[in-house]
């Protein structure tokens, strides 16, 4: 395949006598001089004496005109050198590709670089964004889902000719990994069933069908939507997620796609929305269950703490002591231990310190078993230290 290298200059050649014919074609010169008369001149005009007469590349006939055109070492009639598309004569420059001639306007329209997003041609002076073999306008280099314009440094994925930002690609990956949509999404309305062929009904018989898993079965062609087509579909989906036949036909006419492609896109979009709603509901249920478990645990902990709380002051009993219930003088002065045979066993007397405690009274807490610190100190001051009592007994014994 020949590739055009740019506009070719057209040269005009003037044919002379038989000795100069090949020379003039090789050097690509243009000359104009008076015609000679006579037999030789007539032979030159008829081309009978020119053994290397030029043949037109377009019509494949010998060139007997006074002037001829040369393009890529090929000769052309002036009337044959014209654009293949618009049929306009080429006088100053042309583009040559696949053995065909084009003018500048038609060549740029057919073979110039086109944006992979909007499919419009890209001017030579425009800035572009490249992704592998695809070229985009700066405004068309955006995510096909969220339509966010991708800039230098952003992470994206080029999947089947469509640009996806990182977040939307991960969402789509999670949707695909979670499983296929429910069978309820494949149910079609009455007007949709007319567009489906009866022979394709076995595809939706169940998940156990081997039709989709047969490696020998050829894959169906995947339709890649442009940005304008996707915007038109989304705008119609916001109005109605299940449009009627008339709306689908209108969308198909506007986008240049078939009615079947429009119908399949709406089915896939409904399944996607339903799957997202189901996932959101599962997340809400999981959060509610976690919150309920935390509330149950906190209520149990509060119950355990309240079961070990101290008793109210009205329920606590403090043991009090009466000063008149015991004698401050455990023995009589002037009596010695031998004169009081039983006093050496009970030097402080037989009276008990604690009185008036009913047998029915029970200790309800550990605080009932202890006296206040101030009361214990006052009692020790009144009773005295036992060591001091022993010394006083000894001094009274020897004094007697």
From Swiss-Prot:
Q: Which CDD domains match?
A: homeodomain, LIM1_Lmx1b, LIM2_Lmx1a_Lmx1b
Q: Name one Pfam family in it.
A: LIM
Question: Keyword Repeat on this protein?
Answer: yes
Supply one GO molecular-function term: DNA-binding transcription factor activity
Tissue specificity of this protein: Shows a temporal expression pattern in three main areas: neural, kidney and limbs. From stage 13 onwards, expressed in regions of the nervous system including the placodes and otic vesicles, eye, specific sets of neurons, and in discreet regions of the neural tube. From stage 13, also expressed in the presumptive pronephros, and from stage 27 expression is predominant in the capsule of the pronephric glomus. Also expressed in the developing forelimbs and hindlimbs. In metamorphosing tadpoles, expressed in the eye, brain, muscle and mesonephric kidney.
Question: Taxonomically, what lineage is the organism?
Answer: Eukaryota, Metazoa, Chordata, Craniata, Vertebrata
- This protein's gene is called lmx1b.1
Give UniProt keywords alphabetically: Developmental protein, Differentiation, DNA-binding, Homeobox, LIM domain, Metal-binding, Neurogenesis, Nucleus, Repeat, Transcription, Transcription regulation, Zinc
* One of the protein's GO biological processes: regulation of transcription by RNA polymerase II
Is Transmembrane helix given among the entry's keywords?
Answer: no
PROSITE patterns given in the database record: HOMEOBOX_1, HOMEOBOX_2, LIM_DOMAIN_1, LIM_DOMAIN_2
**Chief subcellular site?**
nucleus
Induction info reads: By activin; retinoic acid (RA) inhibits this up-regulation. Expression in neurons is regulated by calcium (Ca2+) activity: the lower the activity, the larger the number of neurons showing expression.
Give the CC-aspect GO terms. nucleus
Query: What this chain does, per the record?
Result: Required for early specification of the kidney glomus, lying upstream of wt1 in the pathway controlling glomus differentiation. The balance in levels and expression patterns of binding partners such as lhx1/lim-1 influences differentiation into glomus or tubule derivatives. Involved in specification of serotonergic neurons.
Subcellular location, record wording = Nucleus
- Please state what the protein is called: LIM homeobox transcription factor 1-beta.1
Where the record puts its DNA-binding region(s)?
218-277
- Every copy of the LIM zinc-binding domain together lies at 54-113, 114-175
Q: Where is this region: Disordered?
A: 175-228
